Structures are given as structure tokens and as C-alpha cells.
């Protein structure tokens, strides 16, 4: 697997460039090997141009079984991923988007089970409309979420709001159907779930108090969350999850990407679709039994040895059931199997 970056959105550091991003990519490759037994190679591209990155990756794609896009700033990351999916016949996966979405879905599944609510009946408000925030909502909506309001620095995102980039305009058309306007503090009233992928201190205790009964908080900004767990619980939160390892319920992408790529490679998949992501999320959520499920334990630990095999198996089965495998689609595998090869 190639781990590709341009160094424009490195976690906690921002736009530091490809050279400075190299150690982070090397660390990612080490995690691939340690947690998924997947060999990975860091590729740091010295360009911020979408077409440059797409061309570079396309030209080397034949050397890899999959591409993991990493730490590329929004909205360019969406365009790069989309174009690579069109030009490459191997899986393209932007972990900052989809890995985070998978883990969040797994956490939401178990948190809702704990408080006795259903996804298609709850109201979710998010803070942050970048790569992770948008991917999370898209995946949750594919599972039946209906009532969701996304917010950014300027407040609620709704159709017709001025100054939205094309990606936010797209999201405005499928979210916030009542066109609620205002700040996060105004639109979060009555919400069942808050999902933050934004900035430290965005969510206050007063906001939590205005949410519905047994509110669920995903405060995933790193290294400082939107609200700290003790503050959220003091304000009435039933379940709190963060991106930090020193608190329970860590949303950690290492629960997803190693096992997901292991399953993708095992199935010789040519794509990563929503069905495969959902399968990964349910596999992760299922590692916490009903007997074990508590407000302090909705997600397995990053070092849980069961994670890789559970995720890999679920993803591979989903890939095969959807026939998104290169054995069926890749020209190289068709040649090997003699499919479509004219015999003399």
C-alpha cells in the first residue's frame, strides 16, 4: 500500500510540507505493518496541485495493491480521491475521511444501543465541515440518519447560505432540511448527538445542557477536544468519546485502516465502497458485547488483538458479496484467468 501525502494537513501541525510530513507517513506505515500485517511505503509529493498529485499516484499505482491518502487538506482531498478512483483500478482510501467515519459509526451504533435510541429518529449536530466531518455524515446518512445539521465557523450550513464551497453546497442540499440558521449554540438545542471534528473548546457545558435527554458527545478534535469528558458528563452527557488515548472511548483510526486494507488486499478488491465501510464499523462495534457495553466502553481498545481479523474478515466478505474485486474487474487478473482472452 502507498501512503500518499502532500503534507498540507498533518494532524496537529497543519501545512508543514512533504519533507516534514515524511516521519508522520513513516509512522503510518509502521502502524499498517504492526496492526494489519500490511506492507506500506510513504510517498510524499512536493506539489499542492490536484492534477500533479493525481498524475503522480496514477503513474505509480501499478506497484501497489491500494492507495491510502493521508493528511491532504480539504477541499482538495475530495477532488484528488474522486479523480484517482476514476483513473486507478485499485482501492483509493482517504483515511482522514473514511477511517474516522467508520470508527465514529461504530461508536454511534453502540452509544445509541446504550441509551435506547435509533439512528433514524435522532437529531445530530456536527461541528466541523472538513474532510472528516463530511465523510462521517455521509456514512451515517447511508445508514438511515435523517435529521442532521452541520456547522462550521460561520454557523449552521443550509442551502442558499452565501460563501459555501462546492462540497459544502452539496452537503447543504441533503442536510438541515428545515434550513435552521444560527450558531452552534442555537442549533444544538434538542440534539441527541454532537459530533465534533473542529477546534478546542467549541462545545460548552451550557450547550450540552440544552441537548435532548442522555446526550451523546463525540469530541474528536486533537490534541484538545471540543469539550473534555469530565466537563461534558458534569453537564449531563450520557456517553462521551474523544480522539485521545488517555480517556475512554477513543476514536482511533488504527481500529480501522490496518484491518480494512488487510481485508481489501485479501479479497483483491478494486474499490472501497460504503458497504465495506459499514461492515468494518459493525465488526468494530461487535467486539464490545452487550454484557460489556457501558458508558466508558463503547469502542474496543486500539491494542485489542481481535480487531484486525474481525475487520479484515468483514471487509473481505462485503467486497466479495458486492463483487468489487479485481479478480473480476482488473485487466491483469482477467488475463491471468483467461477471461476475455481470445484463444487461438
Stretches with model-predicted labels:
Residues 323-344:
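Single conserved hydrophobic/aromatic residue that forms the stacking wall/gate
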Residues 2-122, 312:
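Glycine/serine-rich phosphate-binding loop and adjoining beta1-alpha1 elements at the start
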Residues 95-96, 115, 219-323:
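Adenosine-phosphate binding glycine-rich loop
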Residues 11, 18-33, 94, 98, ...:
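Glycine-rich phosphate/diphosphate-binding loop of Rossmann-like nucleotide-binding domains
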Residues 36, 87-88, 144, 213, ...:
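Short, structured coil segments at secondary-structure junctions
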Residues 169-238, 244-246:
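Rossmann-like adenosine-cofactor binding region
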Residues 42, 68-71, 92-95, 126, ...:
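General beta-strand structural signal in soluble alpha/beta enzymes
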